[in-house]
């Protein structure tokens, strides 16, 4: 006779966890909302407003992921229970083996959904922007900023996210003084929101002829892209708009005309710029999107004292607000909030960030 206790214990655990996450994710409400969204998308007139149709389509995709997964888990557990009964009646080890395989697949699916539940913020499912800014330290800090940009681009690529370089300011000798990228993909902001903070690099500088150790800092700031229907009031009189000739990456066209745009929101001091579009009009539209997103995030930060303090101190990029330390000589990268370490420094700099990101999300940071 074969052993049934392990798989029955596993099924009991899967059943309990499925019910817990069903409640946590407000499954019944999502089912109702999915029906409403489907009904709206079936109306012919919805396509007269493509932006609304696109927003609803994105919402439907997110709702379907949760609803379909939970339904599949519930049905899957019932199917495994039926297989176990069949195996017992027929005394068939092969059927029990098949039941175990299906139970393991359900466990994997549930674990993935449990991780997704951490993306419960109102904008976690949206696209986002990532600003990188070099700290004091000249060329070394600017080179570090370019390394971080490459790291995040590689990470986004590994996730299947699309990236768009919105603005880049070249360093004096090498590297970058600042850069902004737009990241598009499911839960882009949810994945990256805990990456906001100071990143510290310790290494023997390739720019130091004496090969001495240097400590450099760069800041990352992640904020969600907000929909046009979010009520954010921007008074045109509060804006200073400058146009200039782009520098750095972007192709030949941007360097021939003064198409790059910089907008300063004078009441808040927020500055946004864009140079990747082919016209002033395109770049201005992109700048206004970024400005709306930053103003929204600023309002959200007022509800969170710690985040607000970090944003106010963002110009002082140094020892405060550090989230991660990259000590290349010791082959050690450590997240200072969760204690997670990775000694494969090259893999991390090549975009292997999930271990750090998942730990910070699970810690509720």
From Swiss-Prot:
Record Gene3D superfamilies: 3.30.160.20, 3.30.70.1660, Release factor
Gene Ontology molecular function terms on file: translation release factor activity, codon specific
Keywords recorded for this protein, A-Z: Cytoplasm, Methylation, Protein biosynthesis
SUPFAM superfamilies associated with the record: Release factor (SSF75620)
Entry PTM: Methylated by PrmC. Methylation increases the termination efficiency of RF2.
Modified-residue entries (N5-methylglutamine), positions: 252
Domain of life: Bacteria
GO term, biological process aspect, one: viral translational frameshifting
SMART domains: PCRF (SM00937)
Pfam families named in the record: PCRF, RF-1
InterPro entries in alphabetical order: PCRF, Pep_chain_release_fac_I, Pep_chain_release_fac_I_sf, PrfB
Compartment(s) where it occurs, according to its Swiss-Prot or TrEMBL record: Cytoplasm
Any Gene Ontology CC annotation: cytoplasm
Note, other: The gene for this protein contains a UGA in-frame termination codon after Leu-25; a naturally occurring frameshift enables complete translation of RF-2. This provides a mechanism for the protein to regulate its own production.
Biological role: Peptide chain release factor 2 directs the termination of translation in response to the peptide chain termination codons UGA and UAA.
NCBIfam families on file: prfB (TIGR00020)
PANTHER family: CLASS I PEPTIDE CHAIN RELEASE FACTOR, PEPTIDE CHAIN RELEASE FACTOR 2
Annotated family: Belongs to the prokaryotic/mitochondrial release factor family.
Name this polypeptide is given: Peptide chain release factor 2
